[in-house]
C-alpha cells in the first residue's frame, strides 16, 4: 500500500469533504476508518456512485489524504473518477457527499447516477 500525492486534476478531495469525514470518523471513535468512493453499474444513467466507510485498503487502491483523513478508491472505479472532485454539501435537500465528474456525459437529477 502506498500513499501518493495527486495534482488537483487527478482526484480532488475537498476540505469540506475531508472535514466531514474527520467529524464522522471521530464520532465513530475509530481512526482507522477511511471514506471509500466507488462506481457500480446501475442507476437511471448507467453508473452510480457509492460511499462507505472502510478500515481496509487493498494494495492497488488509490489513497488521497487531506486533513489527516483518507479517501480510498479501487482501480476499477478510479478510471471513472479521474479528474473528479469529491465534496460535501448541505442544503434544502439534505446533507451528502457529492461528486463533480468531468468524465460524465449525462447525469441524473439526483446527482448519484451518470453515464460516460
Curated annotation (Swiss-Prot):
Pfam families linked: Fe-S_biosyn (PF01521)
Cofactor(s) of this protein: iron-sulfur cluster
Stored Gene3D superfamilies: HesB-like domain
Record carries keyword Cell inner membrane: no
Assembly notes: Homodimer.
Matching PANTHER family: IRON-SULFUR CLUSTER ASSEMBLY 2 HOMOLOG, MITOCHONDRIAL
Protein name, as recorded: Iron-sulfur cluster insertion protein ErpA
Organism of provenance: Pseudomonas entomophila (strain L48)
Amino acid at each position: 500500500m502506498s500513499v501518493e500525492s495527486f495534482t488537483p486534476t487527478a482526484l480532488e478531495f475537498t476540505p469540506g469533504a475531508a472535514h466531514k469525514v474527520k467529524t464522522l470518523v471521530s464520532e465513530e471513535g475509530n481512526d482507522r476508518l477511511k471514506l471509500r468512493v466507488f462506481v457500480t453499474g446501475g442507476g437511471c444513467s448507467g453508473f452510480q456512485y457509492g460511499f462507505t466507510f472502510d478500515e481496509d485498503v487493498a494494495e492497488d487502491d488509490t489513497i488521497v489524504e487531506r486533513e489527516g483523513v483518507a479517501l480510498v478508491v479501487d482501480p476499477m472505479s478510479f478510471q471513472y473518477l479521474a479528474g473528479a472532485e469529491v465534496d460535501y454539501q448541505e442544503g434544502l435537500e439534505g446533507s451528502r457527499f457529492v461528486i463533480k465528474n468531468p468524465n460524465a456525459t449525462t447525469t441524473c437529477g439526483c446527482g448519484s447516477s451518470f453515464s460516460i
